[in-house]
Amino acid sequence: MIDFGNFYSLIAKNHLSHWLETLPAQIANWQREQQHGLFKQWSNTVEFLPEIKPYRLDLLHSVTAESEEPLSTGQIKRIETLMRNLMPWRKGPFSLYGVNIDTEWRSDWKWDRVLPHLSDLTGRTILDVGCGSGYHMWRMIGAGAHLAVGIDPTQLFLCQFEAVRKLLGNDQRAHLLPLGIEQLPALKAFDTVFSMGVLYHRRSPLEHLWQLKDQLVNEGELVLETLVIDGDENTVLVPGDRYAQMRNVYFIPSALALKNWLKKCGFVDIRIVDVCVTTTEEQRRTEWMVTESLSDFLDPHDPSKTVEGYPAPKRAVLIARKP
């Protein structure tokens, strides 16, 4: 059974304590009424995993855990079988005691693009919105963050996160809550807020930016990564039924338009720090994610376009400050 008591105890002693006015009731409601039909199966998988304290843990360059003595072939096979029960694995990769989880996304590449532009994360309390399996939260801890809190309503991601955490010795420096940002009160408590790969899924992108701002302390930093298209400050793509086979894509602005949106929401010191085309090396089918991936969503005769004829995925990273 996945338990949030450790997180409640942790925030009871810090500047997130006011969250306890609403959070336990929300989680209790989720446990009672909103659990996925496969959640028990997934959470049982986490229960069956051994809790291992890493002898060597590298979160700075990767998410890699090693034991002092190599695990037996049987132990490795058991861990691998259990982790495969939590497929598909989309965000990673993870290297855990000889089990190498080759995820759909090379999320480490994104982190390498983002990290050089961030304010020093040392000692910071961080919110990661739409955090997936939590890969980037572990990298935030590796970069010196005091606490990383992720929110993502996808319950498989919660179980993937808890599985990795258990194999990292039940590390309590990162926590994932099965919530969407619209369920958070205006906490105004995080030094840095990340929203990566979320904005284009929101029906109201400016409302999302306001919600992100409401989570930041004054002078806090927003890290926003999202799909963009080429164009000036007035360019926004509103796809039809699907974009790259995704139904839930609503607005894809140019990076300059996105900069204006941030300005309209009251952010300052807005910087476009990276723009790059997503490649089929960065997002692809693997043994740990065996269904369709990016190559299936692009025009086979012209990979600069999606199968629907839109520009192929390009992503920008913007950094801004809440005054």
From Swiss-Prot:
It catalyses: carboxy-S-adenosyl-L-methionine + 5-hydroxyuridine(34) in tRNA = 5-carboxymethoxyuridine(34) in tRNA + S-adenosyl-L-homocysteine + H(+). The keyword tRNA processing applies. GO terms for molecular function: transferase activity, transferring alkyl or aryl (other than methyl) groups. Its EC number is 2.5.1.-. Homotetramer. Catalyzes carboxymethyl transfer from carboxy-S-adenosyl-L-methionine (Cx-SAM) to 5-hydroxyuridine (ho5U) to form 5-carboxymethoxyuridine (cmo5U) at position 34 in tRNAs. HAMAP family: tRNA_carboxymethyltr_CmoB (MF_01590). Belongs to the class I-like SAM-binding methyltransferase superfamily. CmoB family. This is tRNA U34 carboxymethyltransferase. It comes from Shigella flexneri serotype 5b (strain 8401). The gene is cmoB.
